[in-house]
Regions:
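Non-transmembrane domains of secretory- and envelope-associated proteins
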Residues: 27-134, 268-301, 305-306, 313-318, ...
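Extended beta-strand-rich segments in extracellular/periplasmic secretory proteins, especially
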Residues: 176, 195-211, 223-224, 279-350, ...
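Sec/Tat signal peptide C-region and signal peptidase I cleavage site
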Residues: 20-26
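Bacterial N-terminal signal peptides
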Residues: 10-20
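Solvent-exposed N-terminal domain segments of exported/luminal and surface proteins
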Residues: 32-244
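Bacterial N-terminal signal peptides that target proteins for export
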Residues: 1-9
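An acidic-aromatic
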Residues: 221-224, 228-280
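Extended, compositionally biased non-globular segments
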Residues: 326-391
Length: 456
């Protein structure tokens, strides 16, 4: 183990040091590239020292979190200072599906960005396999790699996830407390892609697409809490990048379907803390933000979790999950500012793992540029979404099995588990199973009539 640990840390240090600028090239670079190199060099130095100070088997808590400040976001650090813990394990490679790798090799060479930062000539796979940090479009390319990640390519279903929301604080005797105010259970969350399909026919596109959408998503009906029973939403994301998403919210108690604006997608609904655009790290339109690359460096992330259901942290009363974290060789740090008037956040600072093109955490800032929220995502890799299920994938896939959103200013948090804590035998995730899978639904499930019918 000692020899293996030394190898992992050496590799991480080498990755960090590779970010430092080459003095012999500095004079030939434009000013923005010099600034990027300077920032990367400083980040690399801090990350190198921090990486050398940790090893697998360590537990990061509020007593020693300062030594990894350069390896986590300010939001993650705030969560640890509140009582969360990070158990350090060795780095492990993220498996990428063979079909996705083949599509990347076949199509990526033809992909470009237009003047509005929309993808052109993309068919399937990773749009930009290699990103030059000195490219003025680097941040946009990183976000498109995330937007077209291998996480799912055809369809996605989540059955019976549950979530709790409430205040977290120290009680009168100093005990960390998470006071749950509401418990949420939703029947289904489904997402159907019409483009970039790799695993089941029709592929790479669904030709029958009268709504001209890239994907459709449904989240309904809510089963709990009782006063929100039947509430749900349906969203369409269109092929045309200039067209706003259509998101319809149905509330049975007033028998009303309401259309949400793009700005309202940043609002946290029903007394909990996550907004529609924060699911998965970022679920908004990529061309509708101005993106800037802050840097790249090794950082810690939770990408190979072991616990199902996720392990609740006792140190903060249970508002976060105490899971395995590893030193990832390269994490991109990207800042995004919405072009939409009235958006709730002044900026999002998003951390994207280069190998997986996944977002393990992101920090959200208020209109005064103060840190407001942190989104923490726990990911695991397996050929089964849950060991109890009766189906397996031919390859390992990634599954988000837990996430937490902390409102650091209000002292309020929402945690979710997939599968839900009350349904430990449930698969939870159904990823790329195809239109003929037993749990599949007809196309008209993604519609307002279906939304209303399910909510009655």
């Amino acid at each position: 183990m000692k020899h293996r640990t030394s190898f992992i840390l050496t590799a991480a240090l080498a990755a960090a040091c590779s970010l430092a600028p080459n003095p012999s090239l500095a004079e030939t670079k434009p000013d923005h590239a010099k600034a990027a190199d300077s920032h990367a060099g400083a980040a690399a130095a801090g990350a190198s020292a921090a990486a050398a100070a940790i090893k697998p088997g360590d537990v990061i808590n509020k007593g020693n979190v300062d030594k990894v400040s350069d390896l986590i976001s300010p939001g993650v650090k705030a969560a640890v200072l509140n009582g969360s813990e990070l158990s350090i394990v060795p780095y492990a490679k993220i498996p990428i599906p063979k079909a996705y790798i083949e599509a990347t090799e076949k199509y990526s060479g033809q992909v470009t960005l237009d003047d509005k930062n929309d993808l052109k000539n993309w068919v399937a796979g990773r749009p930009f396999p290699t990103v030059d940090p000195n490219d003025p479009k680097a941040a946009v390319k990183i976000m498109w790699n995330f937007g077209r990640t291998s996480y799912f390519n055809d369809d996605l279903g989540v059955h019976l996830p549950d979530a709790d929301t409430g205040a977290y604080f120290k009680s009168g005797d100093g005990k960390p407390t998470y006071q749950i105010e509401r418990h949420f259970i939703v029947d289904w969350s489904r997402n159907l892609r019409f483009f970039g399909r790799l695993h089941h026919d029709p592929r790479p596109i669904i030709p029958d697409n009268p709504d001209q959408v890239f994907n459709k998503q449904g989240f309904f009906p809510l089963i709990e809490p009782f006063d929100l029973k039947g509430v749900g939403s349906v969203s369409f994301r269109y092929i045309d990048p200039t067209r706003q998403d259509d998101t319809w919210l149905y509330t049975p108690t007033i028998r009303r379907v309401r259309r949400l604006s793009s700005a309202q997608r940043s609002d946290a609904l029903f007394g909990q803390d996550i907004d529609l655009d924060s699911f998965g790290g970022y679920a908004g339109q990529i061309p509708w933000f101005d993106w800037k690359l802050i840097g790249q460096k090794p950082m810690l992330a939770s990408l190979h979790g072991k616990n199902l259901p996720p392990k609740i942290c006792p140190g903060d009363g249970g508002v976060t999950y105490c899971e395995d974290w590893e030193l990832r060789p390269k994490m991109w740090i990207v800042e995004g500012r919405a072009r939409v008037h009235g958006y709730a956040y002044s900026k999002r600072v998003i951390y994207v793992d280069d190998e997986a093109s996944m977002i393990p955490y992101s920090d959200l800032f208020d209109n005064n540029e103060e840190l407001w929220k942190v989104v923490l995502i726990n990911i695991r890799s397996s050929n089964q979404p849950n060991p109890h299920v009766d189906f397996k994938y031919d390859e390992e896939r990634m599954f988000v099995y837990g996430f937490t959103v902390l409102d650091l200013q209000l002292g309020h948090g929402t945690r979710a588990a997939i599968p839900g804590m009350a349904f430990p035998e449930e698969p939870g995730w159904y990823i790329d199973r195809g239109l003929q899978a037993p749990e599949a639904v007809p196309m008209d499930w993604y519609s307002i009539p279906s939304l209303i019918a399910a909510g009655r």
